Amino acid sequence: MMRIASQLTFCSPDEIMRRAVVELDEQKIITRLFSLDGNAVESAQTLFYDGILSAEIISVKEQVSMLDNLASEYNYIDLSLGIPTEIVASEKPLLLDFGTHSPEKINQIFAGLTQVISAFSIFEIIAACCYYPALVVGEGASLSANRKTKILLWEGSDLVNKRITKQTRIRGIS
């Protein structure tokens, strides 16, 4: 069993937990998700990280054949084709598709993406990379008990202003 905690845990756009522990079994299935607030002591054998925890980034392009249909429901941006000069916020949820699951490749794209997505909060960006793609491919989107997923750490972001920075990086921790 593995326990991971950080300042913030992105479960869904409507649920962002502070000081939460994600408990995973050997198969990477979440067994529990709980807050440390109100506990007299810290959870034993918990790895603490500086940043935001989320589910894994999903590439819709790798799993969905009818990408044209996405435009009616999402502000779909295919970053595997290059970084756009501008991403305009719309009524539709933003969906960022890196065309890969590799944190190294995603971090390379992030380096050039910072200015283009500066109008969006870090939580909108995490939802665009993790939550909405999971909905599209039919997986459980919320970070919750019984979900099998890799856990990512979003580090180097501005947690006070809830923005990404040029130092923002992701890495797999489970």
Question: Each predicted region: which residue ranges?
Answer:
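Histidine-rich, glycine-flanked metal-binding segment
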Residues: 2, 12-78, 85-87, 93, ...
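A cross-domain feature marking catalytic cores of carbohydrate-active enzymes
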Residues: 79-83, 98-100
